[in-house]
Structure formats: structure tokens, C-alpha cells
Curated annotation (Swiss-Prot):
It is found in: Cytoplasm. Its main location: cytoplasm. The keyword Cytoplasm applies. InterPro entries: DNA-binding_RecF, DNA-binding_RecF_CS, P-loop_NTPase, RecF/RecN/SMC_N, RecF_2. The keyword DNA repair applies. The gene is recF. Transmembrane segments: none annotated. This is DNA replication and repair protein RecF. Belongs to the RecF family. GO terms for cellular component: cytoplasm. SUPFAM superfamilies: P-loop containing nucleoside triphosphate hydrolases.
Length: 358
């Protein structure tokens, strides 16, 4: 999987950009504020339909312009696709095209472009709330199980309906229609998450032994309620509590994927550098699992490669990325910070005030 060409129009300070990328490593070098992270953000947006920096997409559109447009040429296993996304300022409309055809969804783009993002802010995967770790698992299931996305969407829709109904009813029988289907979906999604977490665990632990040999990293999945309890029974038994609180307390929406180091929560005992290495290990293990199981490679996006890592650890990460045979985009302030990451096939772009050159 690789993006061979990217055309950008009106995306932050990138007014008009047309770039051809290496299928291996691509280095984006420039001072803070030069536009290198914006370029990384545009690639992420093309694959996710959202930004990793801003929750308000219309703010990404260049000032006084009506829209931004991203167009990419995608290559995978001798096949090529043309993909495009336009975000309009008026009404915030998003238009998606694949091979020139309208009517596609953002999820169609996401399926075509499996990406792993590594940023300094990405430590929330480890020291943030459980929602970040559920998203980590669900990303994998989205790419491994074709019917996961529809089941996950239906589950979230039913939870919203149930929570709204809790505000209006005093009789549990009014919720039974939702709870029968909700229980089925909850068990299915939780089973998929459990199986995926267990399949991923050996690869995570193996990568952690390489990156953090001084630590014993343990991985465990918690589905969001007692695994020995039927979820339908739990919903009925907890009706009064859920009604009092105003939302459904237990369930797959409370699941967590937890990590310990030498028996203690990693967020309590690891340094920021160790947390970053663990986060990198998780992303790499997940990408490698996709390759092994589905013969599909990820695109890795790495912002501020040198942050929190010493030269030795940067070398370890660089070598593991080279072994993955993935397309990699890396930002850095100076080329010197990338000296450990100099594979045979690479391309370096200089970024200065929204202007990009080889």
C-alpha cells in the first residue's frame, strides 16, 4: 500500500501542492510552522475524513477559500486507485470520490488506506481514557472483519436510543425492544474485540521485548462488564441505576485494553520516552498483524520523529520500520535528526512556509 501522488489545494497554508512520493520512506524537513505537519495532516485526512489536530474541519480550509481538495493516486499489489476528498466551508459538506465515482463514504476511503499515526500527542493511547484504546482495537477490527463497521455503528446507535429512552421512561418493559438487539450486538462486538486482542497480544509483547527489554509488558482486555454475566440480564438488573444516572453504565462502550509494566499501570511507572516506545510498538505490531493476516501494509505517519527518543532508540524504531516494507512519512526539523533512518529508497522534501521542494 502506498500513496504515489498527492495533490493538495487550500489545505491550511498549502495553497497548491502536487507531490510524487517514494513507496518507501518520505522525509518532510522544515522549521516549526513551515507546513510539514500540515502535509502529514492532509495525508491523514485523506485516509480518515478527519484531522488529528482539529475537531473543526472547516478551520483547515485556507482563509477566504470555499473548500479544500485532496486527490491521491493509490497503489497496492499492482492495482491503482484514484481517490479524492473535498471539504466545503458552506454547510461543512464532505464529498468523496473513488476512481471518479461519486457517492462513496469516508469509511470506503479508510478501508483503502490503512494508516498508523505516531505523534507526541499519541501518548493518550496509553495515558488517556479507555476510548483511545477501544479505538485502537476497533481500527484493527475494521480492517480485519468486513462486517465489524456496520455492527459497531448499529451498537452505538442503539446505545444512544437507549440512553435517550432512559430519560423518558419509568418502566423497563419500554426498553426491552432495544435491549434484545443491543445484547446481541454487544456480545458479538465484545467477542470480536476479545479474539483480536488475544491474537495481537503475542506480536505486541514480541515488539516490546525489542524496544523495552528492561520491562515485562503485560496486555489484557476487559470487555466492559463481568465476562461471566449475560449482558441482557445485566441491562435488566441495572435498569434502576441506569435510569438514575441517565445513561447505560456497563457494556462494550466501557471496554478497555490495558497495559502494565512489571505489574504496574504503564502510565504510572514509564517515562515519556518509554511511553513513546511502547506506543510505537503497539502501532507497529498492529500494522504487522494486518500484513500477516490480510497481506496488506499500513502507511505510517510519524510527526516529530526525534521527540522523546535518544539516538539508540531512534535507530531501533527506524530499523523496525525498514523491516515492515511499508510506506513511511516522517517529519523532522533538521535532516540530522533522520540520520538513523536512511534506507536505500527514500525521498526528502524541504518545507518552507507552505512551499515544498525536493
Amino acid at each position: 500500500m502506498a500513496i504515489s501522488r498527492l495533490i493538495i489545494e487550500n489545505f491550511r497554508n498549502l495553497a497548491a501542492v502536487d507531490l510524487e512520493f517514494d513507496h518507501g520512506f518520505n522525509f518532510l524537513v522544515g522549521n516549526n510552522g513551515s507546513g510539514k505537519t500540515s502535509l502529514l495532516e492532509s495525508i491523514f485526512y485523506l485516509g480518515h475524513g478527519r484531522s488529528f489536530k482539529s475537531s473543526v474541519s472547516t478551520r483547515i480550509i485556507t482563509y477566504d477559500k470555499p473548500y479544500f481538495t485532496l486527490h491521491g493516486r493509490i497503489w497496492e499489489q499492482q492495482h491503482e486507485w484514484s481517490v479524492g476528498l473535498q471539504k466545503q466551508r458552506k454547510e461543512g459538506l464532505t464529498l468523496v470520490k473513488i476512481n471518479g465515482e461519486d457517492g462513496n463514504k469516508i469509511s470506503d476511503l479508510a478501508h483503502l488506506l490503512p494508516m498508523q499515526m505516531i505523534t507526541p500527542e499519541g501518548l493518550t493511547l496509553l495515558n488517556g481514557g479507555p476510548s483511545y484504546r477501544r479505538a485502537f482495537l476497533d481500527w484493527g477490527l475494521f480492517h480485519h472483519r468486513p462486517n465489524f463497521h456496520s455492527a459497531w455503528s448499529a451498537l452505538n446507535r442503539l446505545l444512544k436510543q437507549r440512553n435517550a429512552a432512559l430519560q423518558q421512561t419509568y418502566d423497563y418493559t419500554d426498553l426491552q425492544v432495544w435491549d434484545v438487539e443491543l445484547s446481541k450486538l454487544a456480545h458479538q462486538v465484545s467477542l470480536w474485540r476479545t479474539d483480536y486482542a488475544e491474537a495481537l497480544r503475542p506480536e505486541i509483547e514480541q515488539t516490546c521485548r525489542l524496544f523495552l527489554p528492561e520491562l515485562d509488558i503485560q496486555v489484557s482486555f476487559h470487555q466492559g462488564w463481568d465476562k461471566n454475566t449475560d449482558y441482557g440480564d445485566l441491562l435488566r438488573e441495572n435498569f434502576a441505576r441506569d435510569k438514575h444516572i441517565g445513561y447505560t453504565v456497563s457494556g462494550p462502550q466501557k471496554a478497555d485494553f490495558r497495559f502494565k509494566a512489571n505489574g504496574f499501570p504503564v502510565e504510572d511507572v514509564l517515562s515519556r520516552g518509554q511511553l513513546k516506545l511502547l506506543m510505537c510498538a503497539l502501532r507497529l505490531a498492529q500494522g504487522e498483524h494486518l500484513m500477516v493476516q490480510k497481506n496488506r501494509s499500513c502507511i505510517f505517519l510519524i510527526d516529530d520523529f526525534a521527540s522523546e527518543l535518544d539516538e539508540t532508540k531512534r535507530g531501533l524504531l527506524a530499523e523496525r520500520l525498514r523491516q515492515s516494507h511499508s510506506q513511511v512519512f516522517v517529519t523532522a526539523i533538521t535532516a540530522e535528526q533522520l540520520k538513523q533512518m536512511q534506507p536505500e529508497n527514500h525521498r526528502t522534501f524541504s518545507v518552507n512556509n507552505g512551499m515544498i521542494s525536493l
